[in-house]
């Protein structure tokens, strides 16, 4: 009698490799590894899954879909969780979940498995997303069920012929994609410890960064980055190029004690050189193209959207409604920002746009001034009238 199929989100690491061995007792395991820009050896991971016991192994390059459908909306919404974290891991979980569900449908699987522990946010993100996309699918979390110590897991792996990675003594837990790199555990768990240089992987320290500044022109069309220094490229490629360029200058290091969805505080080290550079540049183009009312209202929704994404609710109607509003605001967000990369900072030093609402003739204090200053008298009287009336009535 054939077994039921289970779709396993497979990373190639110890946890999900052991999960294959554990799951194959009751299921035919289909391993799925997705490339969202982490730079792994995908062919090795594909073969390892089969070697460990999966009946099928999928490797999917979803960098472009991730960039266009998940990263771009977050960029346009200036999505920072708690004003610091650009949602590196939180953004990739919805697209990974979507692909897992698609493969479950293609293969006739009734169950999806992931390698998350019972302590983190990702278990919630995967399971809420999968339930939103297909409530009939069952989800299991082997690592959460085991409750093994690391030593017990290693012993199980050795007993069952699962290769134990050579770098297993690395104290850090790293997650990486196009939008950045997240690192936790080890000495980072004590928030009084300064993060050592070994904890960073894609950025130079300020001390190691070049002593000469570098400039890059980033061009936006309807809020989407489309070119670097006049060279058009796909969004995923543009982000990757900026990760290297801005990372060289030490841009995008973030040390954050954040409030996790599961109720605890966690100290995380993020490296987001491309993300921070693009978020900075995009905001400056918005500043010269959006009317005041949109500029003031949009951040309110941006903060709420950041919380929704972080808290596993990408597929919630509230998220999609806010994203629709954000998209509507981007129609005239066209232009180029000149960004100075130097010693850990990405600073916009010049900007231009064919839809700029900045009128130099209105702003200037020279003889070219076209602002009607005589109109200010009546404006001030009417603007202050409610306050004046309140004082007359209540401050007797």
UniProtKB/Swiss-Prot annotation:
Q: Which annotated residues bind L-aspartate?
A: 117, 121-122
An example of a GO molecular function for this protein is: argininosuccinate synthase activity
Q: Which cellular component appears as one GO term in the record?
A: cytoplasm
- Name the InterPro entries for this protein: Arginosuc_syn_C (IPR048268), Arginosuc_syn_N (IPR048267), Arginosuc_synth (IPR001518), Arginosuc_synth_CS (IPR018223), Arginosuc_synth_type_1_subfam (IPR023434), AS_cat/multimer_dom_body (IPR024074), Rossmann-like_a/b/a_fold (IPR014729)
Reactions catalysed, semicolon-separated, are: L-citrulline + L-aspartate + ATP = 2-(N(omega)-L-arginino)succinate + AMP + diphosphate + H(+)
Per the UniProt entry, what are the Gene Ontology biological process annotations, in alphabetical order? argininosuccinate metabolic process; L-arginine biosynthetic process; urea cycle
Tell me where it resides.
Cytoplasm
Which PANTHER family does the entry mention?
A: ARGININOSUCCINATE SYNTHASE
* NCBIfam families, A to Z: argG, PRK00509.1
Family according to the record:
Belongs to the argininosuccinate synthase family. Type 1 subfamily.
Q: What is this protein called?
A: Argininosuccinate synthase
**What is the organism field in this record?**
Streptococcus mutans serotype c (strain ATCC 700610 / UA159)
